[in-house]
Amino acid sequence: MARPCAFLMVLVVLSYWSACSLGCDLPQTHNLRNKRALTLLEQMRRLSPLSCLKDRKDFGFPQEKVDAQQIKKAQAIPFVHELTQQILTLFTSNDSSAAWNATLLDSFCNDLHQQLNDLKACLMQQVGVQEFPLTQEDSLLAVRKYFHSITVYLREKKHSPCAWEVVRAEVQRTLSSSANLLARLSKEE
């Protein structure tokens, strides 16, 4: 009789923990991986940003989606997942591999892939728990438009070293913003 009771108690504790943390340890592992990805991005820099000032561009990062005070963690996870997926897609393109040190690029992409796995675990916990709000759909569309403008920019600049440096710096800001969003939300829990 003690074993079934203990088993039930474990299930109750685990389900409570899942409900409170969205079923994953995202704030700790994701934050550490994000910091490592930011460090790798910094190490990937090949040119001084000052030498590429003429190539700078505002890609229209959806900052209002990150700054929104009313955003909940459940809404932030799909947003950060889409950001991470788009960054990984950008840096695994054939044109990207020619622009960076292969070892650093592989490590960076591996970190992004691990972050995506963490985020997917959270998304799976959310499936069926909540509906997909229209504002969330708008956020994902804004992210896709943002990365489309980056892709178009790289094409227009013929994937030049300066264009990639501008994009690297932009992605660094984007990753930093997503990390700050998740850190803020984890403090609110």
UniProtKB/Swiss-Prot annotation:
It holds the Pfam family Interferon. Exhibits antiviral activity against Theiler's virus, Mengo virus and vesicular stomatitis virus. Interferons alpha stimulate the production of two enzymes: a protein kinase and an oligoadenylate synthetase. This is Interferon alpha-13. Keywords: Antiviral defense, Cytokine, Disulfide bond, Glycoprotein, Secreted, Signal. It comes from Mus musculus (Mouse). InterPro entries: 4_helix_cytokine-like_core (IPR009079), Interferon_alpha/beta/delta (IPR000471). GO terms for biological process: defense response to virus. Glycans are attached at N94, N101. The keyword Coiled coil does not apply. Disulfide bonds join C24-C122, C52-C162. Belongs to the alpha/beta interferon family. Residues 1-23 form the signal peptide. CDD domains: IFab (cd00095). Induction: Transcribed constitutively. Not induces by viral infection. It is found in: Secreted. One of its GO terms (molecular function) is cytokine activity. GO terms for cellular component: extracellular space.
